[in-house]
Swiss-Prot record:
Part of the 30S ribosomal subunit. This is Small ribosomal subunit protein uS11c. Belongs to the universal ribosomal protein uS11 family. It comes from Platanus occidentalis (Sycamore). It is found in: Plastid, Chloroplast. InterPro entries: Ribosomal_uS11 (IPR001971), Ribosomal_uS11_bac-type (IPR019981), Ribosomal_uS11_CS (IPR018102), Ribosomal_uS11_sf (IPR036967). Pfam families: Ribosomal_S11. The gene is rps11. It comes from the Eukaryota. One of its GO terms (molecular function) is rRNA binding. One of its GO terms (biological process) is translation. Gene3D superfamilies: Ribosomal protein S11 (3.30.420.80). Keywords: Chloroplast, Plastid, Ribonucleoprotein, Ribosomal protein, RNA-binding, rRNA-binding. Residues 1-23 are annotated as: Disordered. One of its GO terms (cellular component) is ribosome.
Length: 138
């Protein structure tokens, strides 16, 4: 019978394997998903592995305040602060969604000092696909 692999360390001692903050990442991709209710900022390396992420809800905003531009700016700042410490200098930005946080998140990314190679809008647009839901009557 094969011997089980002995694992050194435990949950209390700390995680086993390579930590995400151990890598040096010179170039990455910043994904901004801005909905009307929240803004999610995810930073990945060029292969698509997540390095850092933040959202307006994770930054402490609750309810309707999560959809505000200020919340998006805070979320973008938090996500980017960690990758700048890991040595990221260049990035591509992919913005998705119709939310209010689009411009505010992009402004926060520009202010961070990361050189942006391009900014692309990847909002999914139907070529007359599914029928949209009926209009709200308030």
């Amino acid at each position: 019978m094969a011997k089980p692999i002995q694992r050194i360390g435990s949950r209390r001692n700390g995680p086993i394997g390579s930590r995400k903050n151990g890598r040096r990442i010179p170039k990455g991709v910043i994904h901004v998903q801005a909905s009307f209710n929240n803004t999610i900022v995810t930073v990945t390396d060029v292969r698509g592995r997540v390095v850092s992420w933040s959202s307006a809800g994770a930054c402490g905003f609750r309810g309707t305040r999560r959809g505000t531009p200020f919340a998006a700016q805070t979320a973008a700042g938090n996500a980017i602060r960690t990758v700048v410490d890991q040595g990221m200098q260049r990035a591509e930005v992919m913005i998705k969604g119709p939310g209010l946080g689009r411009d505010a998140a992009l402004r926060a990314i520009r202010r961070s000092g990361i050189l942006l190679s391009f900014v692309r809008d990847v909002t999914p647009m139907p070529h007359n696909g599914c029928r949209p839901p009926k209009k709200r009557r308030v």
